[in-house]
Amino acid sequence: MSSRRLGRLLSKLGVKRGAASASARAAAVPDAHLYRPLFSPWFGEGEFQRYFAMAAPRTLVSADRCHVLYTLLEQAFHIEGNVWECGVYKGGTAAMMAALISDRCPAKRLFLFDTFEGMPETNAAKDRHRKGDFADTALESVAAYVGHGALCVFRKGFIPDSFAGLEAERIAFAHIDVDIYQSILDCLHFIWPRLSLGGFVVFDDYGFSSCPGARAAVDEFFLGKPCRPLCLPTGQAVVFKGVSAP
């Protein structure tokens, strides 16, 4: 059948040629429903959704950002060292990561750092958050939600004081979600020298206008270093510690 005759037939059936073509193109694209407009696998029904369901009730971290954590954490399982999260809040992303570690790499430990009483003093010139923000949490509640017993090591207190005694630690993956300039700098000064080659640091707040101090701290720390932050459209930034990185 010629294209002209097919067009007339479709017209009689009430189907416009453009709509038919669009439908055919969509059918030819695997997982077409996940293009919104770009491929967005965190909307799918795969394994990630099971882990994200653990995070969702108790986190402000969106599905696309959790998918970044999930994907990079899996890739860090073969790297020497443990997993750190600085800025736990109500424990949503901690619960997701603890479950993933328990299932895939139970030899690793998840270190969790937070005041569990809200933010410390902030820098008024660099930060929009203020002391006491995110105080609606408590260590006991978070620990009960995250679970996984000895796999999780909770360190309550201010950063960097809560890092005391961990100088010999090796780190494979770190999630830094503390929002404010000085705390992020303090995290980096301690974590970066202990991050194993091939390891990742994910900064949750880098690209958000609500956290200008986050980007300022990250950019300042990595200025002149061979490793540079990769800014993602999720608002996060990722730094990979390459083979030659100091």
Model-derived regions: residue spans:
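Membrane-proximal basic amphipathic "stem/tether" segments
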Residues: 1-56, 242
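S-adenosylmethionine/decaboxylated-SAM
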Residues: 35-63, 70, 77-246
